[in-house]
A protein has these predicted regions:
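Short beta-strand/loop motif that positions the catalytic acidic residue
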Residues: 214, 220-222, 226
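Short alpha-helix in the alpha/beta-hydrolase fold that links the catalytic acid
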Residues: 216, 230-240
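Conserved alpha/beta-hydrolase
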Residues: 50-73
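Active-site glycine-rich loops that stabilize anionic/oxyanionic intermediates
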Residues: 33, 38-41
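N-terminal cap/lid segment of alpha/beta-hydrolase-fold proteins
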Residues: 1-25
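Catalytic active-site module of serine/aspartate enzymes centered on a nucleophile-bearing elbow/loop
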Residues: 244-280
Length: 280
């Protein structure tokens, strides 16, 4: 597996950090997959996913979103929701230019799934397909009403106010090794600003309401026991989207399907779905 890093500067001066992984023999590349990570994450958490895809003949390109990993900016914050979608747009541009003539896919998780789905619906990109795991369309729990009401006021008067509340590692996976990696990760964080949080809530609702406008073949997978994001909401999205969106529920799994003990089953499903799209 060959690896290189890339970087670019956004119009507002924010320096973005990305990574590319591809098979040693570039002639063996059948497709390129753009990775979009979740809240508090970074591309370093997806090396094993990139390796799996490389071994299956897919190049992989990903980037640390604004306020995450080695990309600049206040942790857990973005100036606008549009700025997050611009990151996905740049990701797909890099994928297409780096591997001309090769089918391009998206693979997005959690918060990244929210952004990716909104990008698919609002921008209607010409790509071969998308895979979304555990998308944050709605939370799996209901925050206290008073806390939400205060948060909405804070969003208006102090949008960059930060709440530091890391996710419980045990809610992410049942794999002890992956839990330890998560806890020891120096680039991971649990920070999110008021503006970022409510932007996600609004975008999630919008995506569900407009799911029937989906034009890109999509595989959506969710842990049925997810304690972070709502599997009911992602199933609702898939139902609204119609036959173009296939939904798979994973019993006995937690939020991070690709970090679970039985992740090889998930990887197998991903590979078969991607290969199936290439065969069409």
């Amino acid at each position: 597996m060959a690896h290189r890093e890339l970087a670019w500067t956004c119009e507002d001066g924010t320096r973005m950090h990305g990574c590319v992984w591809h098979p040693e023999q570039r002639s063996n590349i059948g497709g390129v997959v753009g990775l979009v990570h979740g809240m508090g994450e970074h591309m370093g958490r997806y090396v094993h996913v990139a390796q799996m895809l490389n071994e299956a003949g897919y190049a992989v390109i990903g980037f640390d979103q604004r306020g995450h990993g080695r990309t600049e900016g206040k942790r857990g914050h973005a100036p606008t929701y549009e700025a997050l979608m611009e990151g996905v747009d740049r990701l797909l541009t890099e994928a297409a230019s780096g591997y001309p003539g090769v089918p391009v896919f998206l693979l997005a998780h959690s918060m990244g799934g929210n952004v990716a789905l909104n990008y698919l619906l609002r921008k209607q990109p010409d790509i071969a397909g998308a895979i979304v795991t555990g998308p944050w369309l709605k939370l799996a729990f209901k925050p206290p009403s008073l806390q939400v009401a205060i948060g909405r006021i804070v969003e208006r008067i102090y949008p960059s106010y930060t709440n530091d509340r890391p996710l419980k590692a045990a809610n992410l996976t049942t794999d002890p090794e992956m839990i330890q990696r998560y806890l020891n990760d120096p680039l991971g964080h649990g920070q999110i600003t008021a503006k970022f949080f409510f932007s996600m809530l609004r975008a999630g609702r919008w995506a569900i309401e407009h799911a029937n406008e989906l034009r890109v073949p999509t595989l959506m997978m969710h842990a049925t026991e997810d304690r972070v994001t709502s599997s009911v909401a992602s199933k609702q999205f898939a139902d609204n989207a119609g036959p173009l969106c296939e939904w798979i529920g994973w019993d006995g799994f937690r939020h991070e399907l690709m970090n679970e003990l039985r992740r090889e089953e998930v990887f197998d499903t991903i590979r078969r779905w991607l290969d199936g799209r290439l065969a069409r």
